[in-house]
Amino acid sequence: MKFSRFGRIGLALAVSLGTGLGVTSCSTNHAVGYFYVTGSQYNQIGGFRIDNNLGNLTATENSPYASGGYNPIKALVANAGKFLYVLNAGCGQTGQSACPSGVPAANAGANISLFTIGGKGGLSFQASYNSQGNQPVSIQADSSGTHLFVLDSTVTDPTTCVGYVSSNPDTICGDITAFNIDPNTGRLSLITNQGVKNGNGTNLSYFPVGSGPINFVVVPSNSFIYTIEKGSGSALDPSQAVFVYANNSGQLALSQNTPIPTPAEDLTYIYASAKYVYLIDAGQNVNASGLILPYTAGTNGALQSLVGGQVPNSGTTSDPGPMTVDHQGKFLYLANQGPNLTPTSPSSSVSGFFIDPTTGRLTPLSGASSGTAVSFGAGSAPQCILEDPSNQYLYTANFADSTVTGAVINSTTGTLTTLRKSTSFATVGQPTWCVASGTLF
């Protein structure tokens, strides 16, 4: 077919105008971010592209990636999505089970692996680093992306622990190792403790916490770091308590004389939103499905319980795990890790709550009259839960069936509905954690 001169000009103008106005059938079908899953079965990281239209996940180029160590358990994205850090717990170290046969000695120790994130979500390994304690359990970064923290189960020198008794191993404390993050390369440099020295007069290379640390969180304002811990039960190290550090550009200082006791039976997770701090009590004496303990942060980081106190989780779930609050601060979602292994066992699910904008009080979604949370479907044994960078979708990565499960978030009601095309996506074996990185591509 041939066009006249005027026809060619008209066609060119139409194409130009359509392009300028963004009038194209696939204008919104782009990636809104990348989703990464750590898996312990093969020591891998699964990478996915998040589709804007449907929330579907498609593998990034060359995924999966080696985690840079053995037993990856946590990860985080820092510096506006430039860097991915993976915490490998290792094996065969103090207090750990023996390594499986065939694990190279170089991979047996715990480390933090640094990856750069490419334009299409691909990962490139850069370097690895070590925390200053034993058995790392979690990793966090401040909201500025300039400092990284690792929580270790035990210190290398127990004499630096407050309340340590040599005849009682339960009094060996944990620690937080702090690093500066280079904004250009992502490389880490250790921050020494300027407030505490060892018996030789040398500044510690870590910041001691209480005994039996379980998990920790940096509040969004970066002002405090809260660590939940089992504790030894002494006056200086109470059981089921929260250890508080004030954070000043990665330099940590005690802001409370002793850890803050809680009424919990079995603390398992902690999460901090812009306004509130939430603890999970997985104990079954009060409520078989666990409790949420909501707080505000007061003077010097002291936790003040919200009016109404603890909130029961859904009665049809078990093993309450990680949680997240949506970008509006309106809804809290809790991943229940019940394994879905038998028809009679409590099912894995997501509990949803509305957050009162004035009081912070949690109430179940959908106006349930029972006073317990409404539950939404999830894969088997979810280990993490997050909202995607476009604030449209909620995802969990599930240990028992090695999948990622997605749902659409109703921004008005908070209810979750299945993705329109596919709900479940296969990923690396035995997922342990998940993170997402936003993008404009």
Regions found by a protein language model. Name each.
Residues G22-F441:
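Predominantly soluble domains enriched in secretory-pathway, periplasmic, or organellar proteins
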Residues M1-R5:
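N-terminal secretory signal peptides that target proteins for export/translocation
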Residues G7-I9, S273:
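Short helix-onset patch at the extreme N-terminus, typifying the N->h transition
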Residues G10-G22:
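Bacterial N-terminal signal peptides
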